[in-house]
Structure formats: C-alpha cells, structure tokens
Amino acid sequence: MNILITNDDGINARGIKTLAEKMSKKHNVTIVAPREQKSASSHSISINIPIKIREEKIDGLDCKAYSLVGTPADCTQAGISLLVKDIDLVISGINRGFNSGTDILYSGTVSAAIEGAIYDVPSIAISMDVKWDRDDEDYSKAANWVNKVVDLAEKKYLKKNVVLNVNVPNINEEDIKGLKVCKIGKSTYKTEYVLLEEDNDKVYQTRGVRNQVEKDESDLYFLSQGYVTLTPLHFDFTNFKELNEVKKIFE
C-alpha cells in the first residue's frame, strides 16, 4: 500500500521514525510531518498563513519525507492534495503519550488521522503511553501492534470514512493482555493554575491530574488493565440520540 505517515510531535520525533521503519518493510511510505512540536493542536489548520514545505532526509530511512511549517491537519491535507499520489492509508503517530478518552478532542495526532477520513482515505492514529521524565522511549511495541492492525485492516477492514484510534500501554510487550475494541471514556482532570508572574498580565502554568478511571467498557479502563485499545472514530459530531427530540422542540 501507499501509506502517508504524519504526527503532531514533529518530524524529528522518535515515534514517527520507528513507525516509518516498520511500515517501510512492506509498504511504500511517505512522511509529511510538522517541522516543530505541535502537540494538542487539535484540528486547527492554517488559514491566511503561508505553508512552508521542505524535503528532508531522515537518518536510517529511505522513504520520501517532508517537513511542514503548519499543523498536523495541514500535513495530512498537503500530503493528500499535493505531495503524494494514490494514498491508500494515513497513519498518524506514534504519539508520545496516550490519545484516549475525550482527550482525543485536543489531539493533533488523532485530528491528522481524521483529516484523512474527511478526504475519504482510511486512517489510523497510534499512540503509546510514556514515562514523561525521560525521552528515550522504545516505540517498537507500538509499531508491532499497529502493524498487526494494518495487516488485518488491509485484508478485512479499510473504510474510507473511519479512523481507527489505537493506544498501547507502557508495559513490557509480553505483559500486554491483548487488544480490546471499545468506546472512548470521559477524561476528567483536577486542574491547578500556578501563578508564575504578575505584571500587566497574570501568567499561569496549568497542571492537570487525571481523576480516577471508572470501571466501564472504555479505552481508559482497558488501558489501565494492560490492554491495547482500538476505537473506531468518525468526524460527524452529530448527537443522533438527541436529534429527534431537539427537532420537536426547536423546529
């Protein structure tokens, strides 16, 4: 397959290189990724701002690679519309840290994959939990799991308007219990605002601690239990459960 790989951690991130190495063994890979860190960009795109694109050479990789001064969604859009022909699959990742629960709404990684689905290209987002006090993570287990998903999806499930959101826990690969297909959970946090300085503006640093995960059939719960999770996502935010009732009241 022709695979477009992107992310929100930037073209020099360890995760995207590991992913490209794995996918290049069986597929034609092109990387289009942000030139700088763009985590938590959500689905923002560059409007009325020129987008700069530069071809790159990444050590250890033979595939085409481009860095883009813009957002993760810009990268997917440019890859599909300008840089790569006949894309069969978009993969966004491997993200440094989970993209699970309602945190996916903030995620540039997930949004880059959703942008692919908007353009009718099957897409996958892949993320792995990390220890935040270090920057030497081994993403090979996440690459192995997304490779399994790609192999099976290629045979049985490549749908142009669906994103498969995959998360991998940060435990030994042999300790992973398996894969669970599940809904997203609700991510809530206790957020602390720490005052850093006070002049004309008060400058705060936010610190969030996730509240206890509920024991339900969600990605948050299964990740806490040592499973890889997979959730099918769609860009249609319509609340169909409420649609008819709202029609009766407001039309």
UniProtKB/Swiss-Prot annotation:
A divalent metal cation binds at D8, D9, S39, N95. It comes from the Bacteria. Its cofactor is a divalent metal cation. It catalyses: a ribonucleoside 5'-phosphate + H2O = a ribonucleoside + phosphate. It is an enzyme of class 3 (hydrolase). Pfam families: SurE. GO terms for cellular component: cytoplasm. GO terms for molecular function: 3'-nucleotidase activity; 5'-nucleotidase activity; exopolyphosphatase activity; metal ion binding; nucleotide binding. Binds 1 divalent metal cation per subunit. The keyword Protein biosynthesis does not apply. NCBIfam families: PRK13933.1 (NF010543), surE (TIGR00087). Belongs to the SurE nucleotidase family. This is 5'-nucleotidase SurE. It comes from Clostridium botulinum (strain Alaska E43 / Type E3). The gene is surE.
